[in-house]
């Protein structure tokens, strides 16, 4: 299916701008976070945004030349490691949490707010979308942003209440067994 309108191209251009801002935010947050868990999480989110940008830019370039196929907008299953990749390491190490990133909980909350604004933007555009491929693209973007939001929420929980985080993630019981 060949590209016929500029609506999808405009949308992709806007998405690239949003992703660039998110990538810059995560790079900045990683540089300011003195704790390895926070730094690793922010770096992982930055790298995920870069992968999304690479794919979006390549697809946009092909479509804007008229040589692209709208099927290129169909995203494969995106990588959503969630908290399992970073947080699994914590459960194994069971290191004590430094207070280095407690000051950066505000950065985590800002990231959550940024992801939430992205979700709201994509939901609003989804309501207006008429083309099935555009709807599929937006649905994918919403799922992607939600996975990032969940990862940040988990990181915030880890820093705010580490003991309960370990109890919940480690499936620790309180019966003493």
For the regions a protein language model found, what residue spans apply to each?
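Non-heme di-metal
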Residues: 1-177
């Amino acid at each position: 299916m060949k590209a016929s309108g500029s609506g999808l191209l405009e949308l992709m251009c806007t998405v690239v701008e949003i992703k660039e801002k998110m990538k810059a935010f995560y790079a900045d947050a990683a540089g300011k976070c003195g704790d390895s868990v926070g730094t690793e999480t922010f770096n992982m989110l930055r790298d995920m945004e870069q992968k999304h940008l690479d794919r979006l830019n390549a697809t946009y370039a092909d479509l804007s030349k008229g040589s692209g196929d709208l099927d290129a907008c169909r995203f494969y299953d995106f990588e959503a490691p969630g908290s399992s990749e970073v947080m699994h390491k914590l459960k194994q190490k069971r290191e004590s949490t430094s207070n280095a990133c407690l000051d950066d909980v505000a950065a985590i909350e800002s990231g959550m707010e940024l992801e939430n604004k992205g979700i709201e933007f994509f939901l609003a555009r989804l309501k207006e979308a008429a083309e099935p491929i555009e709807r599929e693209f937006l649905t994918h973007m919403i799922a992607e942003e939600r996975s990032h939001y969940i990862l940040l929420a988990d990181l915030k929980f880890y820093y705010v209440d580490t003991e309960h985080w370990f109890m919940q993630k480690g499936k620790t019981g309180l019966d003493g067994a």
